[in-house]
Amino acid sequence: MHKPFVPLEGLAEISRVTYEADRILGTGDGFAWETRFTAHEGGIWVETTLQTEKALTFNPAMIIWLGTLDNLNDRQAHTWRQTILRAPTTNQQGLGGNDLPAATLYDPDHRTHTLVYFPPDAFQWAVHRFYEFSIREVTEYRPAPRYGLGLLPTSPSPLFTFQPGTHLFRFWYKQTLGDAPLSQWAAQNSLINAITPLLETQPTLIPDSPGWEAMAQNTLKDLHDDACWITIQGKTGLRAYVRGSSEVKRDEAQSFELMTQADVLLPLLLWRKKTGRKDADNLVEKLLDAVRAYQIIEPHSYVPNHYPYTNTDTFMDTWYFYENALIKLPWIAALTDDADLKRTFLTALEGGRELARKTHYLLPLFADANDWDPRHSSLNVGVSGMYAAGCVLAYQMTGDTAHLDEAKIALSTIHQLPPHMLTHEPQQLSFAAAAAFFLHSHAAPENAVSNWLLMGRDFVNLSLRMGYWGKDPAVPFYDVRGMFQACASLCYPAYKENVEVIWAWSELLGTPGYETLPVSLLAAFANFQRCHNYAFFDPFIPASMRRGPCPYIPYEDLATSEFTHTATLGKELYGAGEVFWSALLFDAPDFMRHNPPDLLALSLDVPCLRLPTLNTPNKSRWLIYNPRGEAVEINTPTQDRLLLAPKSTQIVEGA
């Protein structure tokens, strides 16, 4: 379906254009350019190289024009029958971020699906990149009505000045026929499948980097540093940020947060159980005391996030409450067999249920437990995925199937919405997927591929759209691939959210129905994180950027083309627990120690929502992934040799 076209019309307008068999040439006063079209993975790479001897100003929009408009149906039937996914993702006020730059449009007039992907490392010419561009549908009425899909400036002035030199403009597109529009969720699945082959899967290896088990041991040592702790009103807890590490004074708060205590304590309990490390005992008890400082604010069935607090401190950012009080707290209660913490969780769940029902499961970004009503104007409906996760945990702790009914309603409600209404914290989507897979395991056995599995796949795919798929030319000191935008529109990755997104993947990939997921793609992202997440720690960033003690507590922020700060916000103690999650997920088993270091062994025994039981398997399992473009022979737990195909996975078991 490919026909040569001018991708940069703003440049062509000031050029003399010549069409040849396999390329388009343009010349002007002191500049020349060439556009080439190359078939690849069922689509076409479109590459334009501009060479200019002087500053050149034009609109760099790159658009695939799909058809003309009659000014009759274009604002009604024409658009009503389109299916559109824009990029990057946005927050619930519509402000865009800088994650996956891929979009798709179904055109009912020509019955075509068009998909475009603008690789994030091909924007050296755009200083602020996605601060000033988005990828979406476009309608133009001058000089003649037409519509298309592509990269568009979002700033008030669409004109950009290009300095003397060479500039490369590059994107990939694919068009296929389709008799009917897909739902946005189905279109998203097609988009992810189409662009997966474009991902460069080889990770960047850091020479002499320690394994994540060694990182966890160093983090455990750092967590004993006084700079991590604060004592106030007779209670001691972990600060949100290491004292002395924040340029903007986030480390000076005279309080501590439940989020921080729960973030560290839960994975620390699991890590201690796996490793038998007795030197974690004192820290565990100290954190348990801090968690017990949080009591239900009566009569509101609410657990606050900050200590100290009063009975009027009922205003909340909803995802804090649903993640910490309704997911991590019950886990801590289960692992410590603490009946009081279990009661606190079940009481808090009553409050979470009241807000869910009052909002018809379309949860707000902010709320107040004083009346369990929304506050302000924004939604965060993805929090319903966390609510469903809390309900799944409550069911396992009580046996009450009413909790599963609540989880079903919550997930079914948000899945009726278009995907763009669910983007906020990316890990919300992982919890939603884990809850959906749990519901599948309790569905009728004859339904091999239930709607719950497909729903879980959809939530995972949406989280992948919040991921970073390519290197960022503005930050050569680290590789952002495999990380996730910390929150919709924030435009930087954070270690906490990175690991919390993939925490659920161990359980998802280790349970029946995992074949519905993009397994190799998840493995590639997990492998990227295994290799690239070191960038959040002092020993692996430039010395000039380091600040404060505790080198093995992660910084919150790393720079991108859009967000220009690294290690400015401080070392986030509420993300330190993710080092222990990383050790659980990535600690290389013995059989992998003689395999190439770029190969992944992801543990499939790290739980997310499935509480451990007496029936938990004794055999360890791993997902092995080969990121290379050629097959590689590897060792297995049984000492057999396995030939692993390029970019493929294999599940292996060991004693």
Where are these regions (language model features)?
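Short, surface-exposed, polar/charged, turn-prone segments marking secondary-structure boundaries
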Residues: 76-77, 650-652
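Carbohydrate-recognition beta-sandwich/jelly-roll modules
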Residues: 1-343, 347-348
